[in-house]
Regions:
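Conserved PLP-enzyme active-site core in the AAT-like
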Residues: 16-19, 29-204
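Conserved N-terminal alpha-helix of the aminotransferase class I/II PLP-enzyme fold
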Residues: 1-28
Length: 204
């Protein structure tokens, strides 16, 4: 996607979302999540993540050969839904798996539950790990007051944002946001592995 119009659109998106760079994705947030995980992990690497991640995360682990370290969120018995990852759970996983390369967080979960993202980002960075956020249901966090913190505002390294779920765009359109410490060129190479090089301009 070297087209000037697309490059300008990516720059405008990055500015709007407070990211160092934004990539326009046309394979749904599945392709965005997979690119995010494949960027962070190689074969044999460990990644800390909640048990209730989207299947696109698990499929990415199959592709790259990374090893999941699961954190089991508590369940709200009255509502019957999984909650977010507790800080104590994440800290324990980091301590027990100091060689893990990343921590992945749902921000929010399918049911709108958020973890303490700022604290988790700090714990990950203090341990030399990346922090990735699946924000398939959190696009609105970037554009409203009184809402939970967005991944980029919390200092996360990468975030997958589903524009078509909560941003009003056509189905399959998504964004992959990266922070300043992630190599833009390497991410672009990974994206070329996970989505078409002939993206629909209707989706873009």
């Amino acid at each position: 996607m070297k087209n000037f119009c697309i490059r300008e659109a990516e720059e405008l998106a990055a500015d709007a979302f407070g990211a160092a760079h934004a990539f326009l994705m046309v394979g749904g947030t599945t392709s965005s999540v997979q690119s995010m995980v494949l960027t962070a992990c190689k074969r044999g690497d460990e990644i800390i993540l909640p048990r209730n991640v989207h299947r696109s995360v698990l499929n990415a682990l199959v592709l790259c050969g990374a090893v999941p370290v699961y954190v089991n969120p508590e369940v709200d018995k009255r509502l019957g839904i999984s909650l977010g990852m507790k800080r104590e759970q994440v800290a324990k996983a980091i301590k027990e798996h100091p060689n893990a390369v990343a921590v992945l967080v749902n921000n929010p979960t399918y049911y709108g539950i958020c973890s303490d993202l700022r604290a988790i980002v700090k714990m990950a960075h203090d341990a030399g790990m990346l922090c990735l956020a699946d924000e398939a249901h959190g696009t609105h966090f970037y554009f409203g007051g009184g809402l939970p913190v967005s991944a980029m505002a919390a200092g996360a390294d990468m975030a997958s944002v589903s524009m078509h779920k909560s941003g009003g765009s056509l189905t399959q359109s998504s964004l992959l946001l990266i922070g300043p410490n992630v190599h833009q060129g390497y991410v672009r190479q990974i994206i070329n592995l996970t989505q078409t090089t002939s993206g629909s301009y209707l989706l873009i």
